[in-house]
């Protein structure tokens, strides 16, 4: 009788381990899936996509593309970081019904690599002698070192990170 109880305990223990293992795998998949959903990948603008700020066709300026992806899957494309920030700071004007809380991701094109990067991780050079499609521009870089070298080589005035960029900074670019 004692042998039968031991066998039952072993079987029960094995079932419990299997249940915990399956539960762990399910939780892991949900965690990975939700982490991926938080950072949607950038997409390439089509020939029909226009900058909502200036009306220019964005595909003509691949070296300057910026984009804001909303949680509902819609995307706004820009022909430079300056117009992207104008839009970001005045969503009521350009996309009423949306707020900054509706934004899933913001991308800008890194100057040297010419690849889209997370705008929140970029270092922006302001006031350089390099102009974008809409004139004076914020020039994005992966590293502060790259931004510093560019600032020195191209007579830049300041290096800023995302949270330092304000409507007043953007207005100064157009003055």
Predicted regions and their residues:
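N-terminal secretory signal peptides that target proteins for export/translocation
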Residues: 1-18
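Bacterial N-terminal signal peptides
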Residues: 21-32
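Sec/Tat signal peptide C-region and signal peptidase I cleavage site
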Residues: 33-37
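Residues immediately within or flanking Cys/His clusters that coordinate Zn2+
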Residues: 48
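Short cysteine-rich clusters marking metal-coordination/redox-active sites
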Residues: 51
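Cys/His-coordinated zinc-binding microdomains
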Residues: 55
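Mid-length scaffold segments of soluble, non-membrane domains
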Residues: 73-116
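Thiol/selenol-based redox catalytic cores and closely related redox-interacting motifs
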Residues: 99-162
């Amino acid at each position: 009788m004692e042998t039968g109880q031991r066998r039952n305990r072993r079987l029960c223990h094995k079932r419990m381990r299997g249940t915990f293992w399956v539960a762990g795998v399910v939780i892991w998949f949900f965690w990975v899936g939700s982490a991926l959903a938080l950072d949607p990948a950038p997409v390439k603008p089509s020939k029909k996509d226009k900058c909502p700020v200036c009306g220019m066709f964005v595909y003509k300026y691949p070296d300057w593309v910026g984009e804001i992806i909303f949680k509902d899957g819609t995307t706004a494309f820009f022909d430079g970081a300056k117009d992207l920030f104008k839009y970001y700071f005045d969503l009521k004007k350009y996309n009423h019904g949306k707020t900054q809380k509706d934004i899933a991701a913001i991308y800008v094109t890194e100057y040297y690599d010419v690849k889209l990067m997370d705008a929140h991780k970029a270092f922006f050079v302001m006031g350089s002698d390099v102009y974008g499609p809409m004139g004076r521009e914020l020039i994005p870089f992966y590293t502060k070192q790259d931004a510093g070298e560019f600032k020195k080589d191209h007579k830049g005035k300041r290096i800023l990170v995302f949270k330092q960029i304000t409507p007043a900074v953007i207005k100064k670019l157009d003055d």
